[in-house]
Amino acid sequence: EPIRFPYHYRAPVNTGVDSGIDLDGDGKTGGPGDSWGFGRFPGQYGMLVLSRFPLADEKSRTFQNFRWSDMPDARRPTNPDGSPFHPDEVWNQLRLSSKSHWDVVFDIDGKDFHLLAHHPTPPVFDGPEDRNGARNFDEIRFWRDYTFPRPMEYMTDDRGVSGGLPADARFVIAGDFNADPHDGDSAAGAIDQLLDAPWIDASCTPLSEGGAEAAVKQGGVNARHAGDPAADTSDFNDRQVGNLRLDYLLPASSLDVIGCGVYWPAEDQPGNASIGFSDHRLVWLDIRL
């Protein structure tokens, strides 16, 4: 019997939405780097949530328009000489989310369950100011602050409602975070903001035989990586980037985790032929509610 997903959630994202200002510092406007999130058309690299359970749409929240400068102690990108990369009039308009941050609420047996979905920008494709690395770091930090057990009020959603999750909320943070705990180009400690948070359970590290096998067979940069290749969730150019752990399902520490893994079959295992449709791999997590 297949698993059926009769419900879905979608909302606008920032990729490809023209800002009308010069965001990438090339002296021009209207390019893909001048969109609120890099993209050549609105919705490129967008997100979709499929669900077996009904949604509580009236309780769900989006933070597409949240301004980066409204985050306390934001990592404002700076030039090598210490000056701000973005002029104040640009910085004060910048949106934090390269796509969006969604708090999607489901009704499971009459109780709320929160899926916190996002897709932070890759921490590359910039210059010495590291504007994408800084944005990636703070996009990840947003969920740390949002789930912090003592309420933080700075985050305001697209309906104008402020504040984060209640301390007893049931949640899982999900997405392509574009940050590996050991390798790659993300800012130091970016993903550790969540992996080390005591109210988040990161104890179940998803693994696969295919990831370990691919790192050995593909070689290249993979041979110099510090992380366990069995935990990799992406398969990239082995001359420059290599395979990385970028995709996560991070549950609240109050939830009962019973298993997790990465769907990356080894070459001699059933299903291996199905993984070529993407350079990312499916991550799964079983929890008992």
Protein language model annotation of sequence segments:
Residues F63-D107:
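Active-site catalytic loop in hydrolytic enzyme cores
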Residues E1-D81:
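Active-site surface patch of divalent metal-dependent phosphodiester/phosphate bond hydrolases
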Residues K111-A134:
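Active-site His/acidic residue clusters
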Residues R52-D57, L96-H119, L289:
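Beta-strand-turn-beta hairpins that frame and shape the catalytic cleft
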Residues L50-P72, V105-F106, N132-I173, F177-L289:
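Metal-dependent phosphoester-hydrolase catalytic domains
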Residues V17-G20, V124-G127, D180-D185:
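Extracytoplasmic/secreted cell-surface and envelope-processing proteins
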Residues G30-G33, D81-E89, D228-D232, A266-D268:
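Short Pro/Gly-enriched beta-strand edge/turn motifs at strand-loop
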Residues P2-Y7, D109-H114, A167-R170, L255:
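Loop/turn elements at helix/coil->beta-strand transitions in domains of secreted/extracellular proteins
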